Amino acid sequence: MTNTRKSHPLIKIMNHSFIDLPAPSNISAWWNFGSLLGVCLGLQILTGLFLAMHYTADTTTAFSSVTHICRDVNYGWLIRYMHANGASMFFIFLYLHIGRGIYYGSYTFTNTWNIGVLLLLAVMATAFMGYVLPWGQMSFWGATVITNLLSAIPYIGPTLVEWIWGGFSVDKATLTRFFAFHFILPFMITAMVMIHLLFLHETGSNNPSGVNSDSDKIPFHPYYTIKDVLGILFMMITLMSLVMFTPDLLGDPDNYTPANPLNTPPHIKPEWYFLFAYAILRSIPNKLGGVLALVFSILILTLFPILHSSKQRSMSFRPLSQCLMWMLVANLLILTWIGGQPVEHPFITIGQLASVTYFFTILILMPSTALMENKLLKW
């Protein structure tokens, strides 16, 4: 008699994806982030669902409903801070996952990679709208500033902004629709994750050497399930330490002041995970130019498969490319720091230099260095 796991129409799909899946024998801890992101998504949907039970998407009561969740709902403070800090964990893992993909050349799986870029955009949109919901000062002004960027689009811009706002400023209509989108998007993200995995399982996983591993596969379970559980354990320890000891470490104090359209905060800035893109946006004095640079700073990821000029897939055996990779990481950290600083000297100049270096490294330095390495290896 056939094993149910292998014959049942539904369980069979799970089996081929998580149990009997042939996986390379040498994938390192850098391959743990996929499962960690899945756990993060599940956690966000679950905590978000419980928050939505008590939250009211109305300008007059939104702020007090969040206060009510923290003060009066059983473990409401825990749910709220797990959701807020869970988003930070989500982005840490996202960036590490993308960094791994760049370092080991996983972007050569073009379909998987492009769906991944779309996933990143969807998660960024969801996080932005979620930040607006508590209706604090930074929520309101962040929403005003970021949505206003669309007015830079020629001809249709101003109309588009008013259409998104549902009026002539960020108000009740904006908050209500942002809540609706913030609720539905994670489920769309879940569907996209399934497509992401579908494309990945068409080719199989990459590995640190960047060489085809068909001749050396091991079953996903128990080897990588136990490895994933260890990763999840580390993640939960980190997340719960953050939630229990310093829940507001990554937040902005301004968001504990209720939204006031008549009073602008001295420094409007998004959550830390958007600061690098915000720094790129601010480094260009022209509005449309800034918006284009902002969009391209994310969409540039789609160019990696085209820009790959090395005869080797992975950077494991390419020391010069490794140096550039870490230069890019340092550059992004500088951009993140600059994004949180006021618009004044010397931060403006540092931001502009870091923005130019970001695009220059990806578009010119990395492909040309890869070609040089080919020459050095006489390929």
Curated annotation (Swiss-Prot):
One of its GO terms (biological process) is mitochondrial electron transport, ubiquinol to cytochrome c. Pfam families: Cytochrom_B_C, Cytochrome_B. Its cofactor is heme b. Heme b b562 binds at residues 83, 182. Binds 2 heme b groups non-covalently. InterPro entries: Cyt_b/b6_C, Cyt_b/b6_C_sf, Cyt_b/b6_N, Cytb/b6-like_sf, Cytochrome_b, Cytochrome_b_C_euk/bac, Cytochrome_b_N_euk/bac, Di-haem_cyt_TM. It is a multi-pass membrane protein. CDD domains: cytochrome_b_C (cd00290), Cytochrome_b_N (cd00284). Gene3D superfamilies: Cytochrome Bc1 Complex, Chain C. Keywords: Electron transport, Heme, Iron, Membrane, Metal-binding, Mitochondrion, Mitochondrion inner membrane, Respiratory chain, Transmembrane, Transmembrane helix, Transport, Ubiquinone. One of its GO terms (molecular function) is ubiquinol-cytochrome-c reductase activity. Heme b b566 binds at residues 97, 196. GO terms for cellular component: mitochondrial inner membrane; respiratory chain complex III. It is found in: Mitochondrion inner membrane. The chain crosses the membrane at residues 33-53, 77-98, 113-133, 178-198, 226-246, 288-308, 320-340, 347-367. Its main location: mitochondrion. A ubiquinone binds at residue 201. Heme 1 (or BL or b562) is low-potential and absorbs at about 562 nm, and heme 2 (or BH or b566) is high-potential and absorbs at about 566 nm. The cytochrome bc1 complex contains 11 subunits: 3 respiratory subunits (MT-CYB, CYC1 and UQCRFS1), 2 core proteins (UQCRC1 and UQCRC2) and 6 low-molecular weight proteins (UQCRH/QCR6, UQCRB/QCR7, UQCRQ/QCR8, UQCR10/QCR9, UQCR11/QCR10 and a cleavage product of UQCRFS1). This cytochrome bc1 complex then forms a dimer. Belongs to the cytochrome b family. Component of the ubiquinol-cytochrome c reductase complex (complex III or cytochrome b-c1 complex) that is part of the mitochondrial respiratory chain. The b-c1 complex mediates electron transfer from ubiquinol to cytochrome c. Contributes to the generation of a proton gradient across the mitochondrial membrane that is then used for ATP synthesis. PANTHER family: CYTOCHROME B. This is Cytochrome b. It comes from Ctenomys latro (Mottled tuco-tuco). The gene is MT-CYB.
